[in-house]
Amino acid sequence: MFPLLAFRGDRMEILKAKGIVKRFPGVVAVDNVDFEVYENEIVSLIGENGAGKSTLIKILTGVLKPDAGEILVNGERVEFHSPVDAFKKGISVIHQELNLCDNMTVAENIFLAYEAVRGQKRTLSSRVDENYMYTRSKELLDLIGAKFSPDALVRNLTTAQRQMVEICKALVKEPRIIFMDEPTSSLTVEETERLFEIIEMLKSRGISVVFVSHRLDEVMRISDRIVVMRDGKRIGELKKGEFDVDTIIKMMVGREVEFFPHGIETRPGEIALEVRNLKWKDKVKNVSFEVRKGEVLGFAGLVGAGRTETMLLVFGVNQKESGDIYVNGRKVEIKNPEDAIKMGIGLIPEDRKLQGLVLRMTVKDNIVLPSLKKISRWGLVLDERKEEEISEDYVKRLSIKTPSIYQITENLSGGNQQKVVLAKWLATNADILIFDEPTRGIDVGAKAEIHRMIRELAAQGKAVIMISSELPEILNLSDRIVVMWEGEITAVLDNREKRVTQEEIMYYASGQKKQNGRVA
């Protein structure tokens, strides 16, 4: 008997999941979900953290077994016991955390764990056909426009190049479907454009792509369909032509959300931090700027512009070669982060997991970590009760979703981890807060909360510096915008009337300098 195939228009349904259920202790992660993929399409799967997207992907790619439901490939029912089973059926996946071996070559990584002998599964006794492995790897690299050799060591590649290797790994068995989980989270604007070109090329060759991202502008641009999940359930889908940011956000969070806050007025006051002629290697070149109490100063620019490097000098992580730093009008020397903390400066770093938190510590311990000397008795004996009071206070103030202050921080969602980083600096009474990519990798609801917090902190009189690669974030949250290119400031733009455009920022971010002085 031939399998019953479903079609949408003239496109055949190549993957169908029906009534998928997955339970974990105390939670139904995926609740009776249907999901389908048609040939030659790009379908995005979106939802907040905890919506069930990752669990569903793991089921459809053989990492997890469902508790109920069925999966059909080309109309035939299948059971996946491992990712290899899914791979054999033409389903590949590229995870957000790239899974490569640094000390192996590109070609070895492409064939790792699958097939390095022609037509055979690799075993310990197999003789690796290195010529075939090199030739096939070169074909795949050429297909996606990669400019590096199959013999290159992976440890020497950039993040974007590593992702190209992952795409080649996914293509090595000529799949019908590739799942991509947050593929643009660590890419520059140019690298993201190149990835989208690759995705469109894959679609033209008959390969469907399931795209998972928190970046709604990317989702709406690249997708033929958008499927929305919330609380483990499939909420609905939208087709191209029906995409609308407000509609998508409401489907994701179940309520109206003000993505960028309105009506939170800031009144810039005295200069809180001033930097004059800061220099460091060839990364920061004579940088001068000031941020006032009660304002949000946005820093825009492409990757490599020197924004993060500048703030690491201000925070004392790196040592300036020349230049001066003034806090509240007083010249200061900041030789390390401890000096910066004493000056009332807090840094919410780009990589919260590596630089902002100790993931294996509790929420309480992370919040009080920079304040231990201040809240301990005689600077020696920890005051457990005081630690609990401070932690409970900031968990409540910032609406951090955690079972208790004794929850291990690693178990929180990305948005709540970001709030813990913010809480620890607010607990030090920092008056100058530096946010580096504050909403990277967090879902829409949490983004809206962070956006509101940034504006509210400025309204309370804090001096806020915000680095962001998301131009809508820069344009909607900043009172003034500093644009950098290759370590230099090319423009400072007045954005109090919210009249600066993305085109204007990109003009200066590409190296063009503002004439007739800076607009302050």
Swiss-Prot record:
It is a peripheral membrane protein. Signal peptide: none annotated. Keywords: ATP-binding, Cell inner membrane, Cell membrane, Membrane, Nucleotide-binding, Repeat, Sugar transport, Translocase, Transport. InterPro entries: AAA+_ATPase, ABC_carbohydrate_import_ATPase, ABC_transporter-like_ATP-bd, ABC_transporter-like_CS, P-loop_NTPase. Disulfide bonds: none annotated. It is found in: Cell inner membrane. It comes from the Bacteria. Its EC number is 7.5.2.7. The complex is composed of an ATP-binding protein (RbsA), two transmembrane proteins (RbsC) and a solute-binding protein (RbsB). Belongs to the ABC transporter superfamily. Ribose importer (TC 3.A.1.2.1) family. It comes from Thermotoga maritima (strain ATCC 43589 / DSM 3109 / JCM 10099 / NBRC 100826 / MSB8). GO terms for cellular component: plasma membrane. This is Ribose import ATP-binding protein RbsA 1.
